[in-house]
């Protein structure tokens, strides 16, 4: 048994390149089922965020496929075009990377808080789809536990640590007040809700975009307005 990892992130690729390899929750579930069906694959987890896409695979001795080639085939793209943006890790290197990553030490904003939830959600999805295995279960749970310890014991991780908090602190440092200002948040996912709540705390007038086909059921943070995504420029 062993662990392989392959990934693309903000440190090596711009957002337009990273977006080529991004997964929705549904896409990730379908991809994991196909990957797990490959010979030698015991389990797999897909971690896909705005800053990275990473695949973690628990493998048996008969494993022989290239994770990178498999990913490119699934995305319907030429492998050679993007190979330089990817990093591959195996066994100890893959484990160490996940521990550092979960602790926020490889984030654009050092020690940001969202990554722990994203790692937990990635494992939860793999578990729901019966695509993980005992090795990956233990690895991801240990990484989350270690990350929580870092958050509680390391000084630089105390306080709010997200991209939006950093942006707000930067604006306030320049003497700019958000009170009464019109702010639009594109999207109502986890990061969108975090952004909307942070802006509301600064007494901004916040509007959140939602997709029209979801507008009848989606919930937005209290005190925020909503607008269909297609009408955002009007």
Residue ranges and their predicted role:
Residues 1-107:
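A glycine-rich (often HGG/GG-containing) alpha/beta subdomain
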Residues 44, 205-206:
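Hydrophobic anchor at the start of a short beta-strand
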Residues 63, 193, 213-219:
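Short, charged/polar "capping" segments at the starts of alpha-helices
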Residues 202, 220-223:
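Short, structured coil segments at secondary-structure junctions
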């Amino acid at each position: 048994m062993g662990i392989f990892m392959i990934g693309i992130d903000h440190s090596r690729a711009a957002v337009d390149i990273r977006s080529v390899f991004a997964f929705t929750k549904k896409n990730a579930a379908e991809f994991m089922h196909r990957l797990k069906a490959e010979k030698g694959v015991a389990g797999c987890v897909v971690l896909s965020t705005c800053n990275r896409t990473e695949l973690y695979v628990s493998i048996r001795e008969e494993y022989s496929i290239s994770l990178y080639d498999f990913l490119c085939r699934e995305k319907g793209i030429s492998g050679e075009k993007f190979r330089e943006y990817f990093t591959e890790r195996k066994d100890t290197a893959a484990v160490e990377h996940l521990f550092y990553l979960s602790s926020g030490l490889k984030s654009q904003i050092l020690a940001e808080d969202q990554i722990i939830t994203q790692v937990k959600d990635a494992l939860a999805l793999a578990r729901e789809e019966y695509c993980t295995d005992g090795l990956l279960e233990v690895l991801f749970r240990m990484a989350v536990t270690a990350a929580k310890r870092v958050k509680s014991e390391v000084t630089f991780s105390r306080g709010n640590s997200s991209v939006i908090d950093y942006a707000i602190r930067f604006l306030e440092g320049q003497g700019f007040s958000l009170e009464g200002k019109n702010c639009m948040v594109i999207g109502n996912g986890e990061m969108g809700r975090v952004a909307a709540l942070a802006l509301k705390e600064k007494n901004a007038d916040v509007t959140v975009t939602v997709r029209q086909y979801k507008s009848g059921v989606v919930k937005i943070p209290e005190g925020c307005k909503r607008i269909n995504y297609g009408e955002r420029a009007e």
